[in-house]
Structure formats: structure tokens, C-alpha cells
Design a protein with these regions (language model features):
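K/E-rich alpha-helical interaction surfaces of small helical-bundle regulatory domains
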Residues: 186, 190, 194-218, 240, ...
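Repeated loop/turn-to-beta-strand initiation elements of outer-membrane beta-barrel proteins
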Residues: 92-96, 147-150, 202-205
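Residue-level signature of outer-membrane beta-barrel architecture
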Residues: 86-88, 102, 140-142, 195-197, ...
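Cleavable N-terminal export/targeting peptides
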Residues: 1-32, 254
Length: 254
């Protein structure tokens, strides 16, 4: 069966990231003893969806010109995550965990827009990508012996967001053609909920849903057309949202 490049990259990422941890778990190393007995590590596969409330404003003072667009922009992809955490059970049924995570995704959203009037014709192509995320989260929960651990998730995430594309204009106003690209690291809050089921003494499986809300993505640029008119363009995605559905497996040091 053929796997596309993004899926192959994610599988390789999980393999090379996760394998050293299995080796550490099996050998008596200083790090191995440091991790016992309340730590765990694991990996998840991810299906994620991004939402961008995107606006583009363009002005030219020389032409007394203003143009704007508003798109409900979406992206989706597959990803992989590795995580390392520390947990404690108290008062029999209560649970608290602290977890660091790092994930890689093929998430991408493309858009094509054509605008034409008596003054100009424009073609706009663009792509939003979110490839890397990392962060720290707290897991408060409750343990039900016959079911598993129900937990919430509150954390902080950093996401690598890229906007790239091209714009081409022709008409009496003047013509121009160019590309743009900008990458920013955006912080945000992460909220989620999940369920962990015990498979063996050391192994658990996990199902989780996370909702991430990021800082505004703002990208300003300037350019000139063939008539030497200057244009100022502001692109903004208001608080991008990244939803993640995760299915994972983890190992407990016990």
C-alpha cells in the first residue's frame, strides 16, 4: 500500500522519537531510575482541523484605493505526537498529571480567489500550514476502576504557523505579480478531555480531544504596481483555532 509523503514523515517521526524511550525502559540507566515510578511516556496519532477567521485589507493612498477580503479558511491534516508526563493518584479515585508534548502534522489549508471589475482583475492563491506544536498541560481527573481515567486537559501550546501564497493583478490600475511567505510562532491556550484505559500493568491506551486557541496571526507587506503606485497590505487571522482528535498508547514506569 502506498503512503503519501506527509504520512511517511509522521510515521518516521514517531518511530525515531519513540524507539529510544523503549530502550531506556528496558535498561538500567540513570535516566531510567530517575523516571520511576510515577512517570510515563507515549505517542499518539492525530487528526486535526484548523480554522482561520482571515481578513485582508489593502490600501493605496496615491489612488485613494481600499480593497478588503474576508475568508472563513480551513485546513486539515494527519499528525503524530510524543509526550512525557508525571502522574499521581490520591484519595483513591482522584488523579493529577503534568505532561509535556511535541507533535508534527501535515495540516494545510489552501484557498483560491478570483476578483474582477472595471478597474482590475486579481487572482489570489494562499496556503496556511501548521506543522509543529509543543507545550505543557495539566491533567486533573478521576479514576474509575472498572472503566479507566476520565480527565480534563488545561495547557499552553506553541504552534508554528506559516502563511504563503501569490497574488497577480492586471487592469487599468496597474499590474503586478508576486509571492509572499511568513512563518510565526504563536502561543495559545489548550483545553481538552480524554479517557485512558488500562491494557496491562504498564500499558494504557488513550482517546483525547483538544481545542487550541492561538494568538492573532498578522502579516504586513508593501509593494508597487507597474504604474509605480504603492500598496500596503495587512493580512490577519483572528485567533486561529486548532482542533485535534488523538488516539494514543503510553507506557508507565512501575
Amino acid at each position: 500500500m502506498y503512503l503519501g509523503f506527509p504520512v511517511q514523515s509522521i510515521l518516521l517521526f514517531l518511530l525515531f522519537s519513540f524507539t529510544p524511550l523503549f530502550v531506556l525502559a528496558a535498561e538500567k540507566t540513570p535516566l531510567n531510575f530517575f523516571l520511576r515510578p510515577d512517570t510515563y511516556f507515549g505517542f499518539s496519532v492525530i487528526r486535526d482541523t484548523a480554522h482561520y477567521n482571515f481578513k485582508r485589507d489593502e490600501t493605496s493612498q496615491e489612488l485613494n484605493f481600499t480593497d478588503f477580503d474576508h475568508f472563513d479558511w480551513h485546513g486539515s491534516g494527519l499528525g503524530g505526537e510524543i509526550y512525557l508526563g508525571y502522574e499521581k493518584f490520591f484519595r483513591t479515585h482522584y488523579y493529577i498529571g503534568l505532561e509535556g508534548f511535541f507533535n508534527r502534522s501535515s495540516n494545510e489549508g489552501k484557498i483560491y480567489f478570483f476578483d474582477s471589475n472595471e478597474l482590475y482583475s486579481r487572482i489570489l492563491k494562499g496556503s496556511f500550514k501548521q506543522k509543529w506544536q509543543s507545550g505543557l498541560a495539566i491533567h486533573p481527573g478521576i479514576y474509575l476502576p472498572s472503566v479507566g481515567i476520565f480527565y480534563g486537559r488545561v495547557g499552553w501550546i506553541v504552534s508554528d504557523v506559516n502563511l504563503s501564497g501569490s497574488i497577480t493583478q492586471s487592469g487599468p490600475f496597474g499590474s503586478f505579480s508576486g509571492r509572499f511567505s511568513n512563518t510565526k510562532k504563536k502561543n495559545g491556550v489548550q483545553l481538552g478531555t480524554g479517557l485512558e484505559l488500562e491494557l496491562t500493568k504498564n500499558w494504557r491506551c488513550r482517546v483525547e480531544w483538544d481545542w487550541n486557541r492561538l494568538q492573532d496571526f498578522i502579516f504586513d507587506s508593501q509593494g508597487r504596481d507597474s504604474n509605480n503606485h504603492r500598496y500596503q497590505t495587512t493580512r490577519i487571522a483572528k485567533h486561529p483555532i486548532l482542533e485535534q482528535f488523538k488516539l494514543g498508547l503510553n507506557w508507565r514506569f512501575a
